[in-house]
């Protein structure tokens, strides 16, 4: 193999690695943006906006969550001076799916039937996202739940 061929092959490999890295960074940013927007809308009970960031099969879980929110829950949330905030802790992308670990602060925790929710200072949750075409969407297979404090 000549020096010229070696240089061309090396250049092609470096270019391929750069291209793959750029795609990965683009996906990371898109996953983070979708997950954070979903979390901020979901935990601030802007469920219509949250549903726009979900796969079609996730709508039933958004509707179920909405159907279980009482006026007492809304009153507790409206009494707060600060809204819920979400920070992304970790993203793991595997092809057209991604798993996100998120920290949520100052959110309404509704975990008891027949009793108004209560404010939670901080909790963690996990989301799964799927890539549909060029768009990342949250793919719920149940209610979004707090996994730990």
Residue ranges: model-predicted function:
Residues 1-21:
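Sec-dependent bacterial lipoprotein signal peptides
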Residues 21-44, 52:
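Short, low-complexity N-terminal intrinsically disordered segments enriched in polar/charged residues
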Residues 32, 47-95, 99, 105-108:
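Short solvent-exposed beta->alpha transition segments
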